[in-house]
Regions:
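Solvent-exposed interaction patches of small proteins and small membrane subunits
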Residues: 1-112
């Protein structure tokens, strides 16, 4: 029997919410504390993504699932300053909203 996937989906939503709260505190490209906090939550999000069922992920084909999972490796293995803050901000600004919409849809569908 496989583990329930819903807690991982909730971890993703929680990480997205935290990232938005971090952004509300200032520009993460200019503040290393905010930047580090955002990176940590992106790592959490990217670690939870592969634990979602593939059949659920196929319902959101526009989400780059493999890239999200791969982003975790970049975050973990390039932690010594090789990650461009502007790229991170762009990922947050352009990709978290569709991901959140997809995860919410997965959870809503599961409750029906």
């Amino acid at each position: 029997m496989s583990k329930p996937w819903q807690p991982y989906a909730q971890h993703i939503l929680d990480a997205i919410a935290k990232i938005h709260r971090i952004q509300a505190r200032g520009d993460l490209t200019q503040d290393e504390v905010l930047y580090d906090a955002a990176l940590r939550n992106l790592q959490t999000l990217s670690e939870a993504t592969p634990l979602l069922p593939d059949e659920k992920k196929t319902d959101c084909p526009a989400i780059p699932w493999a890239e999200i999972s791969g982003f975790r490796n970049i975050l973990v293995h390039h932690y010594l300053g090789n990650i461009d803050p502007i790229t991170v901000a762009s990922v947050i600004d352009n990709h978290l909203k569709p991901l959140k919409k997809c995860i919410v849809s997965m959870l809503d569908e599961d409750e029906r």
